[in-house]
UniProtKB/Swiss-Prot annotation:
Coiled coil: none
Record keywords: Cytoplasm, RNA-binding
Taxonomic path: Bacteria, Pseudomonadati, Pseudomonadota, Alphaproteobacteria, Rickettsiales
Broad class of where this protein is predominantly found: cytoplasm
InterPro entries from the UniProt entry: SmpB (IPR023620), SsrA-bd_prot (IPR000037), SsrA-bd_prot_CS (IPR020081)
Similarity field: Belongs to the SmpB family.
Designated name of the protein: SsrA-binding protein
Location of this chain's protein in the cell: Cytoplasm
Gene3D superfamilies: 2.40.280.10
HAMAP family in UniProt: SmpB
Length: 148
């Protein structure tokens, strides 16, 4: 598994409820740009239309060697999942406080682009502070154990 890009803010801003692996419908120039890692996942999210899941605001830069028929960098991209998974995700999206965001994009062992999408619930400010305290304590603990 070759990770292309990870959205690190997801783990800090949200509680992760459940994870899913989804395929992404891409065109050729988008795959080439992904291989060059010219992608931004920070503002992206998942929406549901007609019982299909779409990845919105995923910015894949235009491929420089492509001809004039290049892709739109922020177009919505269809996610490929099993129907049972789509029903589960769309049901959770309708609940208050839950949202679906991509955690990271990767190429699997066969070289196919995939997205790890997660159902999340937003953290409050005090939860974020607890996360920072735990991270700082773990860092301090490892320094003490190393003898530094």
């Amino acid at each position: 598994m070759d990770i292309i890009i990870e959205n690190r803010k997801v783990r800090f801003n949200y509680f992760i409820i459940q994870e899913f692996d989804a395929g992404i419908v891409l065109i050729g120039s988008e795959v080439k740009s992904l291989r060059q890692r010219k992608v931004s996942i920070a503002e992206s999210y998942v929406t549901e239309r007609n019982m299909e899941l779409w990845l919105c605001n995923l910015h894949i830069s235009e491929y420089t060697q492509a001809n004039t028929k290049n892709h739109n960098p922020t177009r919505p991209r269809k996610l490929l999942l099993k129907k049972k998974q789509i029903y589960k995700i769309s049901g959770n999206m309708k609940n208050d406080g839950f949202t679906v965001v991509p955690l990271f994009l990767y190429f699997n062992d066969k070289g196919i682009a995939k997205a790890k999408i997660v159902i999340v619930k937003g953290k409050k400010l005090h939860d974020k502070r607890e996360t920072i305290k735990a991270r700082d304590w773990n860092r301090e603990k490892s320094r003490i154990l190393r003898g530094g």
